[in-house]
């Protein structure tokens, strides 16, 4: 598998340019590019779409697609990734950072029985850095979150618009 590429300390346009260059180099173009919409990512997703890339801004703090089971979309995506990893013979990139981050983040249940993923503030209290690689990995399950409960999709002006919270 190819190594994971990380970009740090880039502004919105520099990050957009790096993603566009990566996209242009791909022999097999991604069908969807999911971008964390919190902070810098919202502008990145907007610009990528403007350039014609299939980019979607994901706000993981919003409600999950399967609201009764998860506290928020972040919890839903992390839990879907967990189940996917446990349920299949998978091959992750040979990246120690990603593997470490995936097993570091903990989950619990709320008093109402919803899955809750450890917050960045809780991780920081434990002395754990932000799991950036793992967060990017679990964003790849955003498409599945919409289809898991039959999330509606419609094509308008060449763009896919999903009718679920958190996916723009």
Give the label of every model feature segment:
Residues 1-114, 156-168:
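Mg2+-dependent endonuclease catalytic cores in nucleic-acid-processing enzymes, primarily RNase H-like
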Residues 96-154:
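Charge-patterned, long linear interaction tracts outside catalytic cores
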């Amino acid at each position: 598998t190819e190594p994971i590429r990380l970009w740090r300390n880039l502004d919105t346009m520099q990050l957009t340019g790096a993603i566009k260059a990566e996209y242009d180099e791909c022999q097999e173009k991604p069908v969807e590019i999911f971008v964390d919409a919190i902070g810098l990512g919202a502008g990145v997703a907007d610009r990528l779409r403007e350039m014609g890339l299939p980019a979607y801004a994901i706000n993981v703090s919003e409600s999950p697609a399967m609201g009764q089971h998860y506290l928020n979309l972040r919890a839903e995506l992390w839990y879907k990734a967990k189940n996917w990893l446990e349920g299949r013979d998978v091959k992750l990139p040979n990246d120690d950072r990603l593997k470490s981050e995936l097993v570091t983040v903990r989950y619990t249940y709320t008093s109402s029985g919803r899955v809750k993923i450890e917050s960045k503030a809780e991780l920081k209290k434990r002395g754990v850095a932000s799991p950036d690689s793992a967060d990017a990995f679990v964003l790849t399950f955003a498409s599945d979150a919409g289809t898991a409960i039959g999330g509606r999709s419609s094509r308008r002006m060449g763009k896919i618009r999903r009718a679920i919270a958190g996916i723009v």
